[in-house]
Amino acid sequence: MESFAGKNVLITGATGLIGSNLAENLLKCKDVQITILARNENKVKSIFRNYLNRANFNYLIQDIKEPINSISKFDFIFHCAGSISPDTFNNYPVEVLNSNIKGIINCLEYIKRQGFGRIVLLSSATVYGNRKKNCITVNEKDTEYIDKTDSSSYIYSESKRMAEIIARAYYKQYLTDVIIARFSYVYGYARKCPNTAIFNFIKKALNGEDIILNNTVFERRDNIYITDAVSLICLAALNGISGEVYNISSNNYGNNYASIDEIAVHIVNAANKIKKTNARVKKK
């Protein structure tokens, strides 16, 4: 993190899993000026309570769908904002679209106006769509597979894909310095747990409740721990080539290729040992 010394950094979506961990890691370096952007001030004050009085820490309370309300000059904007909750995909799809598409446009316009600085767009491996069975490894060019338009996650993956297209358009037309980081499934510690499968499984298992899986067959996927994800995104931010895409994944380091049902079994076994409960994994 010392490589960011002397830099002014904005992190959108800073109360989320990746954004909050990224901010806390960068704040370990006192020579970095950090501004976080989030919608919920109470969450900000809770997650970052240890930094509120630090001279190198500021926060903006606003929705990323609106133009960024700041006069600061940022060397880096890490655009982490955007919902990852399946409930939000299903119930508020327009909000998902606006957050991903308007959000990146507002970041790009900010950097374009100030005339310097780099944007790191956090995208997702979901832009690769449903891969062939047992085809886990992909490179950055493998984007020809797409989901059906009635898929519940389509709104997320396609708005991420569109955000990438917009980012590259700004790079081509205005030479805006932007790189794209496509994350595999990120898991790990968060002060505020997101509403995703792994965190919900952990809650249920620790309460001694069974984990009910709605399907019987699950594809294996790459999973990456949050600390590794943060290290890699910082590496990409510092050394990545403008206009390029970088996969952020474990590449099966530590046997991190696993399906969601395999992960559920690991969670249940660990919780049963810790809490002396008898939770189980069941498939409908």
Regions found by a protein language model. Name each.
Residues D150-I179, L206-N207:
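Active-site Tyr-X1-5-Lys
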Residues I61-S99:
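NAD(P)H-binding glycine-rich loop region in Rossmannoid oxidoreductase-like domains
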Residues H79, I105-I155:
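Conserved Rossmann-fold NAD(P)-dependent oxidoreductase catalytic core, especially the SDR/UDP-sugar
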Residues V127-G129, I155, I179-T196, G254:
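Flexible, glycine-rich beta-alpha linker
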